[in-house]
């Protein structure tokens, strides 16, 4: 019998993108950051393939945070 490891996913928060879409941020297996679009329509409710997942502990988090800081800086300059 094949045993597959269950994925543990903990939602951190979400941002409403529209009437039927949210951006959901989760930690997966205590080692990966997942940013995923979730939809709620008459025909489907749940995660889509649109999103990104990366490991937190191989310097990706540091680089991603720097990128978010740059986005925030640019946003502040535009506002």
Put a short name on every predicted segment.
Residues 1-18:
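Negatively charged, low-complexity tracts enriched in Asp/Glu with abundant Ser/Thr
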Residues 2, 30, 59-60:
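Detector for Asparagine
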Residues 15, 27-30, 71-74:
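Compositionally biased, intrinsically disordered low-complexity segments
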Residues 21-52:
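A short, structured beta-strand/loop element
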Residues 48-79:
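Mixed-charge, Lys/Arg-enriched low-complexity segments
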